[in-house]
Amino acid sequence: MGLSLAAYAGAALAEIAGCFAVWAWWRLGASALWLVPGALSLGAFAWLLALTPVEVAGRSYAVYGGIYVAASLLWLWAVEGVRPDRWDMGGAALVLAGAAVILWAPRG
């Protein structure tokens, strides 16, 4: 469980940072040099997601989706300085609950 959570959290941070690098270049006028660490970060995202101990890729991606939503709201608050509202938090709780069902459902 610990490795899985660390891999998902690391993947979320890497994907959000990589996408933000492109956003900064495209939308904020940052130097094109931002694309280099952005591409490296997106590569790290794919590698970390592949480390998750889920037996099939699609299920791993579905679980990751819930973690990505929660991590995106943390990024919104910590990096962009916008505090998530109750609707953001409620939506995140719903998707995390769905991710938990997908991850821990008994399969047989």
Swiss-Prot record:
Predominant place of localization: membrane
TM region(s), chain numbering: 5-25, 32-52, 62-82, 86-106
Annotated keywords: Cell inner membrane, Cell membrane, Membrane, Transmembrane, Transmembrane helix
GO cellular component term of the entry, any: plasma membrane
Record-linked SUPFAM superfamilies: Multidrug resistance efflux transporter EmrE
Record-annotated disulphide pairs: none
Localization (cell): Cell inner membrane
Signal sequence, start to end: none
Membrane topology summary: Multi-pass membrane protein
UniProt record similarity statement: Belongs to the UPF0060 family.
Protein name: UPF0060 membrane protein RSKD131_0092
The species this protein was found in: Cereibacter sphaeroides (strain KD131 / KCTC 12085)
